[in-house]
A protein has these predicted regions:
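Positively charged n-region of N-terminal signal peptides that target proteins for export
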Residues: 1-4
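Cleavable N-terminal signal peptides
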Residues: 6-7, 17
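Central antiparallel beta-sheet cores of small beta-barrel/beta-sandwich binding domains
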Residues: 24, 29-115
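Sec/Tat signal peptide C-region and signal peptidase I cleavage site
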Residues: 13-19
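A generic beta-sheet turn/junction motif
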Residues: 34, 108, 121, 132-134
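Structural motif
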Residues: 47, 120-122
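Edge beta-strand at a domain terminus
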Residues: 123, 132-145
Length: 145
C-alpha cells in the first residue's frame, strides 16, 4: 500500500514537468535579429497527431489589427494575420522531444518553411527552426503559460 501511494505521489509530482516538454501552449515569438517580441502563438494538437499554431496576439509596434497576409499563396491569402494558422502538421519524432515534418508560415513574406520544434530548458522555451533545404534560421520562443 505504501509503495502504491509513493508511486502515485511520484507520478503526480513529475506530471507537470512531463506536460511542459511539449510545444503545446501559448508562446511569445521573439525576433532573433532584433530581440523584439513580435507575437503570441497558441500551439495545440489537432487530434490527428499533428500540431496547429495560430497567431493570437500581435505585439509589434507597427502591427495593425486589420493586416492581412497579402503575400500568402495558399488558402491563407488575404486572410487576417490575427488568427492566422502559421504552424501546420508538425508531428512528434519517435523517441525524441522534437516535432518535425510540418510547415511554418512567415506572414510577412508569405513563405512556408520546413519546421522543427524543440522544447528546451524544461519546456520554458521552444527552439523553432524554419528551413528551405540546407538554409534556415532558428528562433527561441518563450512560454507565456
Amino acid at each position: 500500500m505504501v509503495k502504491a501511494v509513493a508511486a502515485i505521489v511520484l507520478v503526480a509530482i513529475g506530471a507537470p514537468a512531463w506536460a511542459q516538454m511539449t510545444p503545446e501552449g501559448l508562446w511569445r515569438n521573439v525576433d532573433d535579429k532584433t530581440g523584439e517580441a513580435k507575437a503570441e502563438i497558441r500551439i495545440r494538437d489537432t487530434g490527428a497527431g499533428g500540431l496547429l499554431g495560430v497567431l493570437e496576439k500581435r505585439l509589434s509596434k507597427d502591427a495593425k489589427p486589420d493586416d492581412v497576409c497579402k503575400e500568402c499563396t495558399d488558402d491563407r491569402k488575404d486572410k487576417p494575420v490575427l488568427g492566422l494558422e502559421i504552424i501546420r502538421g508538425a508531428k512528434k519524432a519517435d523517441g525524441k522531444d522534437v516535432w518535425e515534418g510540418g510547415k511554418i508560415l512567415d506572414p510577412e513574406n508569405g513563405r512556408n518553411y520546413t519546421l522543427r520544434l524543440t522544447p528546451i530548458e524544461g519546456g520554458k522555451k521552444l527552439e523553432v527552426r524554419g528551413s528551405i533545404g540546407p538554409f534556415g534560421r532558428t528562433q527561441t520562443w518563450q512560454r507565456v503559460e
